[in-house]
Amino acid sequence: MPSPGTVCSLLLLGMLWLDLAMAGSSFLSPEHQRVQQRKESKKPPAKLQPRALAGWLRPEDGGQAEGAEDELEVRFNAPFDVGIKLSGVQYQQHSQALGKFLQDILWEEAKEAPADK
C-alpha cells in the first residue's frame, strides 16, 4: 500500500494536471467558454461615479424631476469611449464647457491625422 505522502502527491499532481487541461480547453471548447461567461455575468456591474462630479451630474436637490423628460446623451470615441448623460437644465448650464471640450479633442485629432499619413 502506498504511503499517505505518495497518495497526497498523486492527488496534487492530478489536480494540477486537470487545471492545466481545463485552461487549454477553453480555446477549443465553446461549451467551456459559455460556462465561464455565465460565471462572470452573475454579478451586475456596479455603476461608478467619481466623487468630484457627484453633485454636478446628479444633483441631490430634486431639480432633475422637472427636466427628466428632456435628457441628453452624448457619446464620442476619441482614444477611448466616453459617454455623458445630462438633463436639459444641466446641458444649458454646462453646454459651453462641454462644447469646448469636444472641440479641443476633435481639433487635436484633426491635427494628428495628416501627420500619421
Swiss-Prot record:
Chain intervals for the UniProt region annotation (Disordered): 29-50
Processing and modification events after translation: O-octanoylated by GOAT/MBOAT4. O-octanoylation or O-decanoylation is essential for ghrelin activity. The O-decanoylated forms Ghrelin-27-C10 and Ghrelin-28-C10 differ in the length of the carbon backbone of the carboxylic acid bound to Ser-26. A small fraction of ghrelin, ghrelin-28-C10:1, may be modified with a singly unsaturated carboxylic acid. Also O-acetylated and O-butyrylated on Ser-26 to minor levels.
Propeptide residue interval(s): 52-75, 99-117
A molecular function (GO) term: growth hormone-releasing hormone activity
UniProt modified residues of type Leucine amide: L98
Keyword field: Amidation, Hormone, Lipoprotein, Secreted, Signal
Subcellular location: Secreted
Expression tissues: Highest level in stomach. All forms are found in serum as well. Other tissues compensate for the loss of ghrelin synthesis in the stomach following gastrectomy.
Gene Ontology CC terms: axon; endoplasmic reticulum lumen; extracellular region; extracellular space; glutamatergic synapse; neuronal dense core vesicle lumen; postsynapse; Schaffer collateral - CA1 synapse
Record field: compositional bias (Basic and acidic residues): 31-43
Lipidated residues (O-decanoyl serine): S26
A biological-process GO annotation: regulation of cell population proliferation
Residue numbers with lipid attached (O-hexanoyl serine): S26
Pfam families: Motilin_assoc, Motilin_ghrelin
Lipid-conjugated positions (O-octanoyl serine): S26
TM helices/strands, residue ranges: none
Signal peptide limits: 1-23
Family: Belongs to the motilin family.
Protein name: Appetite-regulating hormone
